[in-house]
Amino acid sequence: MLEHLKEQLIEHGFVLKQRSSQEVFQKIVNTEENKYILKLVKLICTFIQNFKTNGYTVEKFYEWESQTTNERTRLFLDVCQQCYHEYAKRLKEKRAVDFEDMINESARILNQQLISGKTLDFKYIIVDEYQDISRQRFDLTKALGKICDAKIIAVGDDWQSIYAYAGSDITLFTKFKESMGYGQELKITRTYRNAQEVIDIAGGFIQKNDSQLKKALVSPKHIQDPVVIESYTEEVDRKQTKGKGGKYYMIGKTVEDIVDTILEENPKSSILLLGRYGFDAYNLSRSADFIYDEKTGGVQSKRFPGVRLEFMTVHRAKGLGFDNVIIVNARNELYGFPSQIQEDPVLKFVVKDDHSIEYAEERRLFYVALTRTKNRVYIVTPEQHPSKFVTELISDFKNVKVNGKINEVDDANSANIKRCPICGYPLQLRYKPHYGLKLWICSNEPEICDFMTNDLRGGELSILKCDKCQDGYLIVKEGKVEPFLGCTNYKSDKTGCSGFMTKDYYLKYIRKK
């Protein structure tokens, strides 16, 4: 077809010039669609890294393609496979090896040496942070254990397994005996960082995950008011907050008041500000009360300029401890805590998700946040949109102190959040002047999922341009038997455009595209 098109263009006087791949790439990235290209590149890089972290071979691409009927997934796997081969080719040309291949090749070589009868003289293999182990590192550990005939000591805490996005598989820890073929479990139940009251709350919270191993931790330390919820109102006088950060003003003021409370009790206290995302620190600095140094992670309070405050994401703070901890954004929203962002559907092939409970990984992450403190945890949350983790703590534990009001009804409503029937992302209700309607719109990236509807009863039916009149839109309408798509230009007196589409036709021919 391309050759025929080329012949026709030349025949009609067009001068064709072959462009290099680099020129084509530059042409694409210099357009407005560049952001989509960069997101695709990032997605492919993440996929390939996790693909190799799982120890998969190229045959997996063919296996997955044969198992899916989703056209987008098939296209992605095809493109990703070509990128995978090109990446492998470049590594070979440069006589280079990446980190994932170092581990995979090491496991392969050890298994080859074992077959040839060679051995290594090690009696013990100790693996720390075992809860974050990936399949490839497990394969390396197992191969090393076999060739040495060594005892494997795996040290870790499954309650703190928070790196599924990077390839870790929690079941390799929780089902250690099954995966290794043998084993004895020895529990370390005594801790010295957290007070018993913090442990009881954090432990009760995390063990709602059915996939977690059950244990009871004990500490010699005790404290009153181990977890303090500090709520703030978002309904502030705009004139009063003008030039002070607008909607971020109350967050900054609340954090400042908490710092003041901590310093009154201990002027030398180390204070950690914890965020779910890195931009939580940037948002805090927009309150006009704080200055954030992104390079060092240091935060300076204008009210307490001599006090050293440190900001970290929860992932970065894992393993560290501070006198007091402030979780700065416990809000019920897409980028709140728990995060309601869902990964691209294609990553399900290479990321091991824990579906034992809603937000299982986020729950472990929140547990890590709670246990960074040596004394108290302060949680900053809005009155009207509190994190569902916050309302759960208040409901389940009587010694969680609440300063301010909490509208728990919001959390109940959030449990019924409307989700896209195509990709599962939350739906947002917006008025769109272009259509003259309030529409439910998928919050996913438009190039990934463009679902929108005027009526959720239509299921997967999404608004389309009307091909018949080229002026109206096909929106969900209620039929005698089931919903269908009908043109907005059709009038109640049965005049106007009669363009329509049945649900069966839409699902069979349109949605598949």
Where are these regions (language model features)?
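Short, cysteine/histidine-rich loop/knuckle motifs that typically chelate Zn2+
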Residues: 422, 444, 448, 467-471, ...
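Conserved helicase C-terminal RecA-like lobe
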Residues: 266-270, 307, 316-382
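Conserved helicase motor "Helicase C" RecA-like lobe of SF1/SF2 P-loop NTPases
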Residues: 279-296
